[in-house]
Amino acid sequence: ATLRDLLDLAMVESSNTLTEMFGRLVAIARGQEPTFEGATTAVLEGVASLGVNVSGTVLTDTSGLSLANRISPRLLAELAALSASDPALRPLLIALPVSGLDGTLLERDIEPGMVRAKTGTLLRVVSLAGVTTTADGRLVAFSVMADGVPAGGAYLARLHVDEWVNSLVTYSAAG
């Protein structure tokens, strides 16, 4: 499979194994060791080279599974915006699941076909980052995170995240 095909699979299926592999490939390409530390260092260097502020970001893996990871919603929204505006990053945007159509957004309560985004769910965190077009035709990048979700509360948090994203889809500056 091509890297593009693997990226599509990793995003749609939310494959932690593939994202770890991509981290190792980035490490090798940037002259780092293909280890957790090398991958996370290389990924942060790569993101910073795009002009995105990575200060305060802590990565201990590239799958997003580590509870020690710390990443801001702003950083994720900036990456989503860049993927929509930079042709070199467009494959990342295209690989994201589409609401109501595929992957981790297939059965979310989000307006079908209107959102491309990546989900993130851990024990006490629910997040969604991507792009949508508002009712008045503006393309917007977003990232929303619910942190400190009570045990057993991920489903309810996800419903609130979906409701917030739907408010972006239906937003119109004209009222």
What does each of the following model-derived ranges do?
Residues 1-90:
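A small/polar active-site loop signature that marks catalytic segments
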Residues 55-175:
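C-terminal soluble interaction/assembly domains
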